[in-house]
């Protein structure tokens, strides 16, 4: 259908539209008109992706000079594929309506691991190995040697792409990862470099967060993207953690021991080259005097190690004299390494700021701040000069150089914590240095400054006003949308007591209480008897899940549960979890029914949708607070309090509730889907917790369902499931939660749509 969204003609590839989709597009258009940033919370399963794509594509076509590109960031590869398929549908609809092929290019970009087609590289399992092997086949000096001696290993796909792929742009169309690989095989071109080259002239690029937020990768991949682009971060409820991880470095004793080995290898290589080809080192010295910008204007294939920080002015300066020659630089790194090793010999926890660390460094081993800032770039230049092919081996030293560059660049927003042992094993000496970023806005600031509109969107962003604070930006629109339903298909409830009236909670004091554990077991047992097909249960941590399940086993509860449904458990091993998921789905398909026990913040809670019968009930055992004794977390809470005036308790509750909402939101993946959302902890009923749930869940959480016993909860569930078992046809939805074009244009409907969005 063709829609008029505030004067913009939007092609929408379906015959019917949800009212909230129309409302969402309106808010989106206002954001683009204002050339500002937006925070939008849209219920899960209501067609967020297609609304985003339809509106932004229409905007691109109406104002081609205002918005030149859409950069769509998603978290996992399956999500990226989903976005590309929606885009394909949309483009087909455009072409059908206009009767001609459009000069439109949309493509997905992922790591070499997902795109490489070289027969020697594809069997490798880990991304780091794939990148290293690829580099050893495509580095500029490897290719130069190949020109003289064709028997040397090389990558024919990259050679072919380099020779012919750049002149011929990708034909218009939509390409997912498999399409790129198929094209690569047909033409003999490397799909990874083809995709990286093509994102410059694509209309839509879909890739993972790290390509924009991790400065080491963004510098290589996203540097050339135009300012007049719209950036969308989908499923962005965790975006602050992604920012923080991309800027943090952990150094263990093992890493430092391997650095030692790396330095010795480099020392030998430098001596060997000095004897055979001293000119090469002299050339490098000359380049470094001219400035790093020249040194790093090398080939794209060598840029495997990027700069971990953002300031470009470092690259314009000449490298300090003390680290220009290779030997001096290696000596410099050795002194730095010795100092960090010495700092790890601690008996108690040390916490200090980067300036304090630097002053200690200057006093002990006379290393000044300025040369440290050049460490990462200088190492990159050295590895290039020495023609090191297997870069994966040098990752420990690269990590140390990244740490040096970061610690000397940022004076605030970071903290250094040195722990002599892991809290869980206090008897084993296992020292670790955390260089921890506490300010999420550091990594995302360049994105907000560079692109004219950035949209942060997800199903669980409540409370909305905390995101602009912790990411330090000023949105022009902030809105949360309700879910218009012809039948109420979600049933949230809070179970706060067992049948014996014992309050149930996962808080630390009552965690080991046998009565609480028994009541949790009874809840799962009774729910497994009334809920059809699949139940997903989330615990607050792996440790808590293991101890609870062990107690259930001793009490004989597990045996009773297994009479009703089969049990599957998520573990920390990715492969095991995948098998458990597969079998869980099989049991649901066969009608045997299954229960999946998993963990909030784990793999299952983040990226897996339990559509229809795969998730008829989600039970959240306890409030998923993060481990509050962690020193890194304490430092971050202190920083948030001082910098952004966010109280510690507010942030912890916000963090726990966004994860709880993320877990229970897995059950509802569309309006024809239905499911129970059981919050099993008396603390959920408090105003500060309940008020932080997304609006679309809060609306259906009635006062009657606030502090139920297990039996009362089961009665509510039975009643709800009986309602849901009645036949439900598309006709029942029409006019209410599904609108045709005529219905959408009626005044009454437009008035109703006004109320869906709640601006903040």
From Swiss-Prot:
The gene is ERCC2. Changing residue 658 to H: In TTD1 and XP-D; able to open damaged DNA and incise damaged DNA. This is General transcription and DNA repair factor IIH helicase subunit XPD. A motif (Nuclear localization signal) lies at residues 682-695. Changing residue 112 to H: In TTD1 and XP-D. It catalyses: Couples ATP hydrolysis with the unwinding of duplex DNA at the replication fork by translocating in the 5'-3' direction. This creates two antiparallel DNA single strands (ssDNA). The leading ssDNA polymer is the template for DNA polymerase III holoenzyme which synthesizes a continuous strand; ATP + H2O = ADP + phosphate + H(+). Its cofactor is Mg(2+); [4Fe-4S] cluster. One of its GO terms (cellular component) is transcription factor TFIIH holo complex. Its main location: nucleus. It comes from Homo sapiens. InterPro entries: ATP-dep_Helicase_C (IPR006555), DinG/Rad3-like (IPR045028), DNA/RNA_helicase_DEAH_CS (IPR002464), HBB (IPR010643), Helic_SF1/SF2_ATP-bd_DinG/Rad3 (IPR014013), Helicase-like_DEXD_c2 (IPR006554), P-loop_NTPase (IPR027417), RAD3-like_helicase_DEAD (IPR010614). Its EC number is 5.6.2.3. ISGylated.
